[in-house]
Amino acid sequence: MYKFAVFGNPINHSLSPNIQNQFAKQTGFEISYDKILAPVDDFVSSVQAFINQGANGFNITVPFKLDAFKFANELTLNAKIAGSVNTIKIEADKIIGENTDGIGLIKDLTHNIGIKLKNKVILILGAGGATQGILFPILKQKPNQVIISNRTHSKAIRLAKNFSKFGNTCSFSLNKIKYKSVDIIINATSASFDGRIPNIAFSIANNAVCYDLMYGYQTPFMSWAKTNHAKMISDGLGMLVEQAAIAFEFWTGAKPDTKKVLSNLRR
């Protein structure tokens, strides 16, 4: 039996056990998958105890992705560039860190929603860890431009500069975006979690695809997008399922059917 878990704080809300158990049933693997509340100031002790129990791997969510990045002794290219880890695989003495967030987002946008990113103008709201985790996979799709916008403009400037070698990036503060329209808007801020709407011009949502990394309810960002005539609106549930599938394949080598799981969760 494979032994897996997800670490976070808080963690009760996590859908990961449900998703991973559905994948296991599909593919014929026997797994255990727990939710583990790690102390904010002692992530390492929690994961080390889990590893000592014979763990095969685990997922990491807020606020421990940077801690997991530091804890891993081997990193994939995605994890190195993202600077954070959301999936770890244990192989003997190897603690291999991966970041599946960005690839999960791309798969949801392209496979589930049917949106191509090539030659598109993409606006990303926020310049924190969530944005850093998705930028490299987005730029690999060869969009025309990726605009990073953040309340603290210096963070957006730094992120745009750091990723400029992978594609065409630029930055603006949230209330000074100099674009009248874009093709895709991705909300990677915590505004929806806090019940707030990002401070950006209403007109920019007109006829755009609007995607919120948050999931589970009609977020304030999604309501804002609907009011302002977005062409298509989605939450991040598909991304959650797709990134979980990549983690499952990373651990087991088996590729699960995400559409069935996503359909079950949408019911």
From Swiss-Prot:
One record GO biological process: aromatic amino acid family biosynthetic process
Protein name, entry field: Shikimate dehydrogenase (NADP(+))
Record function comment: Involved in the biosynthesis of the chorismate, which leads to the biosynthesis of aromatic amino acids. Catalyzes the reversible NADPH linked reduction of 3-dehydroshikimate (DHSA) to yield shikimate (SA).
Catalyzed chemical reaction(s): shikimate + NADP(+) = 3-dehydroshikimate + NADPH + H(+)
PANTHER family in the record: BIFUNCTIONAL 3-DEHYDROQUINATE DEHYDRATASE_SHIKIMATE DEHYDROGENASE, CHLOROPLASTIC, SHIKIMATE DEHYDROGENASE
UniProt pathway: Metabolic intermediate biosynthesis; chorismate biosynthesis; chorismate from D-erythrose 4-phosphate and phosphoenolpyruvate: step 4/7
Keywords: Amino-acid biosynthesis, Aromatic amino acid biosynthesis, NADP, Oxidoreductase
Top-level class of the enzyme under EC nomenclature: oxidoreductase
Naturally occurring in which organism (per UniProt): Vesicomyosocius okutanii subsp. Calyptogena okutanii (strain HA)
Superkingdom: Bacteria
Disulfide bonds: none
Residues bound to shikimate: 14-16, 61, 86, 101, 215
Coiled coil residues, start to end: none
Cross-referenced Pfam families: SDH_C (PF18317), Shikimate_DH (PF01488), Shikimate_dh_N (PF08501)
